[in-house]
């Protein structure tokens, strides 16, 4: 049977025997170690503060049915819906995004971005990284020839407030990886269903039946066992010696009131949760906001299902546009 090691030397079986891995956020350990390695040689120059939420509408919503209806174009080009005035005089949006039209004075629509790649794989890469693919790729390709924007922000900012600088939910985008920047700048994935009553973030939030006091007792037990192992590790120069520091960081993360509050959507006012939409995507938007408020530099909310080749009118009258 293969032995899978974590954090430079600790065997997975050791985690299970101590009953710690699922309870104390130890899935973060590798990421914390890698980020610390990267921080040992920071890039020159002072980093500018960046907190960004990228809402990635995978597949691409139609511009004609959202922000650029082209009401004066021929019938076979212009959008199928009526137009509505925005809060900026002279600018109109399509009817399905009428709520966004009312606050257009608070955001900007950039209509000059374009690329010449005819499929989703290459287009996704261009938008996520700012660079075209060096070779043609297929429509469904999951490739990253260059670091994604989130990974670049992670590289420049590093860990803030004990939380990873780059997160994605509920999964990474196809070109959202770090490439040559290294695995330490991959996103921490926040999966699950945040609209459910029992939602918690795997490897970060303590289970409801595990109080911090009990976790502390297990931490002390682990410390006693590791003191015996550490002497041997130092003799053989086992990298697992470094595990202690990252274990402590993982424990601090799950025991931090600030981190727990950010992930606990139950602390949010019920009326606010309703405004975001009581569905998984609406609650992911809310969680993203809470994460950047506590210091996460970049959060990507990956929202699929926007590749409408037909039935667009029915789709845009449904929940997707209401949530957006």
Residue ranges: model-predicted function:
Residues 1-324:
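Ligand-binding pockets and gating/stacking loops
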């Amino acid at each position: 049977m293969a032995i899978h090691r974590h954090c430079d030397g600790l065997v997975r079986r050791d985690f299970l025997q101590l009953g710690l891995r699922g309870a104390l956020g130890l899935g973060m350990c590798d990421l914390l170690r890698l980020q610390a390695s990267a921080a040992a040689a920071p890039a020159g120059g002072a980093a500018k503060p960046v907190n960004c939420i990228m809402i990635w509408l995978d597949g691409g919503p139609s511009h004609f049915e959202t922000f650029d209806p082209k009401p004066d174009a021929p019938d076979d080009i212009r959008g199928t819906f009526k137009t509505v005035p925005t809060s900026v005089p002279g600018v109109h949006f399509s009817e399905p995004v009428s709520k966004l039209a009312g606050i257009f004075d608070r955001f900007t629509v950039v209509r000059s971005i374009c690329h010449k790649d005819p499929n989703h794989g290459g287009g996704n890469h261009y938008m996520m990284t700012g660079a075209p693919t060096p070779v043609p790729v297929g429509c469904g390709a999951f490739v990253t020839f260059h670091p994604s924007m989130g990974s670049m922000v992670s590289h420049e900012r590093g860990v803030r407030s004990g939380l990873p600088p780059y997160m994605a939910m509920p999964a990474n985008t196809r070109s959202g990886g770090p490439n040559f920047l290294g695995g330490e700048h991959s996103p921490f994935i926040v999966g699950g269903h945040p609209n459910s009553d029992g939602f918690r973030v795997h490897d970060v939030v303590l289970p409801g039946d595990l109080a911090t006091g009990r976790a502390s007792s297990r931490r002390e037990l682990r410390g006693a066992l590791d003191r015996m192992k550490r002497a041997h590790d130092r003799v053989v120069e086992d990298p697992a010696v470094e595990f202690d520091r990252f274990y402590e960081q993982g424990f601090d993360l799950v025991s931090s009131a600030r981190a727990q509050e950010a992930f606990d959507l139950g602390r949010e006012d019920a009326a606010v949760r309703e405004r975001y939409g009581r569905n998984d995507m609406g609650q992911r938007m809310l969680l993203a906001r809470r994460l950047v408020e506590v210091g996460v530099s970049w959060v990507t909310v990956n929202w699929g299902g926007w590749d409408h080749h037909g039935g667009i009118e029915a789709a845009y009258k449904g929940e997707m546009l209401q949530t957006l």
